[in-house]
């Protein structure tokens, strides 16, 4: 991969009270030791972002880390009132985030990221248990590639040992051998549950009923103790997280806006409630199947479970469509005073988790990436044929070959599985679709952008690229040459279900700013390497540091030179970035080890 493990060098995560002011002058990033302070007092003059964390002691199924790193200015909503709050009148929710960087219930916390500068070599900070059981911090010098690799190897070795202590390995061996017995002479296992592609929607048929019928209760009162929530912003990005500790499900929405904040604010205020309403409608249409019917459906290649997952995914897509309809209705009512609402839009990434079931939905180029242990390649494990072979001996040899394949996978690097689909002009399929829908407009894609304006090919809002009337409502200087009446972009989402397994380690949700500097494989490798060396530290915070370092290096300036650039002007060097990392390892699967 293109990333260097040496870039894992990360500064000590010191407490704000530890002191340490900013040094004078400018220094190259490689010459400084740079750290982030976690200052509970938000709004420092040199604040560069915020950290989000979840302390759900009653919901130990996952750990959540997040970071919001703005580059665009905190723009007042176009329809904001005169009270100075900056909240859009399009947002009728009880909690508007237009005038605040964050808000949350008591199980979530936000801290301000403040840069610190040291002189001397870069140091690292971690914690290790002392003999008395208390935690003590230790300072380490700069780590070499060998030390980093040793940490990763030791972490993988621990995972391998944990997986070998109980029946899971035997079960995996039995399943693998059974698949080989069903295979043809060449040893290729049969495709048991093919993915279904229905109207461009990918549904993985490998799960069962997941969402509780009581999901609507979580939407009834965001302030109730059984529901914990957090909402924040980074420039034009918005993040919304809801965790139901009573029902054990979680909603994460990341909205990457453009041309103004109104569309993202509207999404943050309305999409979650719309999803809850649609799920309630789907799940209350009929009573749940009795156990014997559910078991029969499971024997039928999981058809019953796949049908229910499809219903949930369709409900999420309907919620997005109806939320956009509501946004356009409000925008039309205010078109005379705020015609620029027709230009505002947002990418949408939503992930809904219930137990081991993950439902992902997106339009635009935000991504959900799952880090998982690669499955072993059993295509070369061939069962012997013929009666002259020793059955027991041959079977033992097959089991040993399969075990070697599992061992190799468990000691290998984590793979990156993208649960979403990119909708941008970088994707040939999307460009071809738009051109085929606009054969009479050779300028539908200009300079790598839709009508020369947007890189994304699907988005929430942005009515001026969906209907001629919205385009005509704009001032002439902002209008595009709209040919015909067909939309240039759509809000048709990609939706997918995935059932988590013991091989899944963590989930990374982010706006596209993260992938300006990393591939998805590099992001997974960076988080794996960091958590191997610093298991108690915040990987999202570490990624934000790496983004800024790479942005500074790419611009040929020092780290602190970049941070001294005012928010807004910094957009020339990096995009707004919102990252949520959900740790799965050792949480959901604790009971099976």
UniProtKB/Swiss-Prot annotation:
Region (Disordered) location: 123-142
InterPro entries: PP2C (IPR015655), PPM-type-like_dom_sf (IPR036457), PPM-type_phosphatase-like_dom (IPR001932)
Binding site for Mn(2+) 1: 256-257
Ranges annotated as biased composition (Low complexity): 126-137
Keywords, in A-Z order: Hydrolase, Magnesium, Manganese, Metal-binding, Protein phosphatase
Family matches, as PROSITE patterns: PPM_2 (PS51746)
CDD domains, sorted: PP2Cc
Record: residues binding Mn(2+) 2: 256, 512, 575
Entry cofactors: Mg(2+); Mn(2+)
Pfam families given in the database record: PP2C
Protein family: Belongs to the PP2C family.
UniProt name for this protein: Putative protein phosphatase 2C 46
Naturally occurring in which organism (per UniProt): Oryza sativa subsp. japonica
């Amino acid at each position: 991969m293109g990333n260097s493990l040496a870039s894992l060098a990360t500064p000590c995560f010191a407490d704000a009270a530890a002191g340490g002011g900013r040094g004078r002058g400018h220094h190259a990033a490689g010459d400084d030791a740079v750290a982030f302070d976690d200052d509970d007092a938000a709004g420092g003059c040199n604040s560069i972002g915020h950290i989000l964390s979840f302390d759900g002691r009653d919901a130990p199924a996952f750990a959540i880390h997040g970071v919001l790193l703005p580059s665009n200015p905190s723009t007042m909503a176009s329809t904001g009132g005169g009270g100075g709050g900056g909240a859009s009148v399009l947002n009728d929710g009880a909690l508007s985030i237009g005038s605040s960087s964050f808000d949350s219930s008591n199980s979530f916390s936000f801290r301000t990221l403040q840069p610190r500068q040291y002189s001397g070599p870069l140091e690292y900070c971690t914690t290790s248990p002392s003999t008395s059981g208390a935690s003590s911090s230790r300072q380490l010098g700069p780590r070499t590639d060998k030390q980093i690799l040793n940490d990763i190897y030791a972490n993988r070795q621990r995972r391998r040992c944990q997986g070998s202590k109980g029946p899971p390995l035997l079960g995996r061996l039995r399943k693998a051998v059974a698949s080989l017995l069903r295979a043809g002479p060449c040893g290729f296992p049969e495709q048991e549950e093919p993915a279904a592609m229905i109207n461009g929607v990918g549904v993985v048929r490998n799960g069962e009923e997941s969402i509780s019928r009581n999901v609507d209760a979580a939407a009834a009162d965001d302030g109730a103790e059984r529901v914990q929530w957090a909402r924040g912003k980074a420039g034009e990005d918005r993040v919304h997280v809801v965790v139901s500790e009573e029902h054990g499900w979680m909603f994460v929405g990341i909205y990457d806006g453009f041309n103004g904040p109104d569309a993202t604010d509207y999404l943050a205020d309305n999409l979650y409630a719309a999803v809850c309403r649609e799920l309630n409608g789907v799940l209350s249409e009929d009573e749940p199947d009795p156990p014997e019917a559910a078991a029969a459906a499971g024997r039928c290649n999981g058809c019953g479970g796949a049908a229910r997952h499809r219903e949930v995914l369709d409900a999420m897509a309907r919620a997005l469509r109806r939320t956009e309809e509501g946004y356009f209705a409000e925008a039309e009512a205010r078109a005379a005073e705020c015609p620029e609402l027709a230009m505002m839009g947002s990418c949408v990434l939503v992930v809904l988790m219930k137990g081991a079931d993950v439902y992902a939905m997106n339009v635009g180029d935000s991504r959900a990436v799952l880090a998982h242990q690669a499955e072993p390649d059993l295509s070369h494990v061939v069962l012997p044929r013929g009666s002259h072979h020793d059955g027991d001996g041959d079977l033992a040899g097959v089991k040993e070959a399969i075990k070697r394949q599992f061992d190799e996978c468990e000691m290998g690097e984590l793979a990156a599985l993208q649960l979403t689909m990119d909708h941008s002009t970088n994707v040939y399929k999307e460009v071809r679709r738009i051109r085929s829908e606009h054969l009479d407009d050779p300028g539908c894609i200009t300079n790598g952008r839709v009508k020369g304006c947007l890189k994304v090919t699907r988005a929430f809002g942005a009515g001026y690229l969906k209907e001629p009337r919205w385009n005509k409502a704009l001032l002439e200087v902002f209008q595009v040459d709209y040919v015909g009446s067909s939309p240039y972009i759509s809000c048709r989402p990609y939706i997918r279900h995935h059932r988590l397994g013991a091989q899944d380690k963590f989930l990374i949700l982010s706006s596209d700013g993260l992938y300006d500097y990393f591939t998805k494989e590099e992001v997974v490798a960076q988080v794996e390497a960091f958590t191997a060396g610093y298991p108690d530290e915040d990987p999202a915070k570490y990624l934000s540091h790496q983004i800024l370092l790479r942005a500074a290096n790419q611009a040929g300036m020092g780290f602190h030179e970049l941070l001294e650039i005012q928010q807004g002007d910094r957009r020339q060097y990096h995009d707004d970035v919102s990252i949520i990392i959900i740790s799965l390892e050792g949480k959901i699967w604790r009971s099976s080890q």
